[in-house]
Amino acid sequence: MSGCFPVSGLRCLSRDGRMAAQGAPRFLLTFDFDETIVDENSDDSIVRAAPGQRLPESLRATYREGFYNEYMQRVFKYLGEQGVRPRDLSAIYEAIPLSPGMSDLLQFVAKQGACFEVILISDANTFGVESSLRAAGHHSLFRRILSNPSGPDARGLLALRPFHTHSCARCPANMCKHKVLSDYLRERAHDGVHFERLFYVGDGANDFCPMGLLAGGDVAFPRRGYPMHRLIQEAQKAEPSSFRASVVPWETAADVRLHLQQVLKSC
């Protein structure tokens, strides 16, 4: 399938009841990065660049729950002080394996023409995410990569900054993915783009917060057995009517691809 067309050539309604613009993407497909696109936590992976492939206990002891970004700023600073340069970190990011079936899924999505608009929301960092995606040949698929800003500083060392501030009590201080996705949808609506359906592929606890934006007809793809999946199950059990989106757990990305294929067949 090289394109995506409504039945009988009719234009479809978006999720807010507006008529979808001709040629506009019909579906927004959002991916997490760590343990979703790639099969590791990239923040753990870069520890391989440290002396002895281990961080000192004095550094690890500085972590505070909810302030992981601040902790990772210290990790990058420490690595830089040990002589680790961005090119060394890039090599590590480039070598992180994709999750099983992920390359096929991303290739499938890329072949669907205007069906999908694809974005990535990650609490990792832009340098690492982009290094990984470029090495895998999938960077151009993503219209926007929304992650903590990072890049070489004036000394040539990798520096990390928080993505934004927010008032969500459930999320880390540097990123609320609900706010990130909400702001993106608002921006696209201002551009005249109104999506028919939202699809969200993730794994972590911070991927649960944006589930509040999903409505009937939308689909959450939590990685089976991971925190996002467990939180969805708890929410469904506590108040079944509160979670309106369909839930399709995945073990390999082939599970996501097969479901999206069925969605396109029903269009």
UniProtKB/Swiss-Prot annotation:
An annotated Gene Ontology molecular function: phosphoethanolamine phosphatase activity
Activity-pH behavior: Optimum pH is 6.7.
CDD domains reported in the protein's UniProt record: HAD_Pase
Cofactor(s) recorded in Swiss-Prot or TrEMBL: Mg(2+)
Tissues where this protein is expressed: Expressed at sites of mineralization in bone and cartilage. Highly expressed in osteoblast cell line SaOS-2 which produces a mineralized matrix, but not in MG-63 cell line, which do not mineralize.
Pfam families to which the protein is assigned, alphabetical: Put_Phosphatase (PF06888)
Keyword presence, Magnesium: yes
Entry's Gene Ontology cellular component terms: cytosol; extracellular matrix; extracellular membrane-bounded organelle
Amino acids binding substrate: 43, 123
Subcellular location: Extracellular vesicle
GO biological process: bone mineralization; bone mineralization involved in bone maturation; endochondral ossification; regulation of bone mineralization
Binding site for Mg(2+): 32, 34, 203
Catalytic residues identified in the record: 32 (nucleophile), 34 (proton donor)
Enzyme Commission number(s) of this protein: 3.1.3.75
Protein purpose: Phosphatase that has a high activity toward phosphoethanolamine (PEA) and phosphocholine (PCho). Involved in the generation of inorganic phosphate for bone mineralization. Acts in a non-redundant manner with PHOSPHO1 in skeletal mineralization: while PHOSPHO1 mediates the initiation of hydroxyapatite crystallization in the matrix vesicles (MVs), ALPL/TNAP catalyzes the spread of hydroxyapatite crystallization in the extracellular matrix.
Name of protein: Phosphoethanolamine/phosphocholine phosphatase
Organism annotation: Homo sapiens (Human)
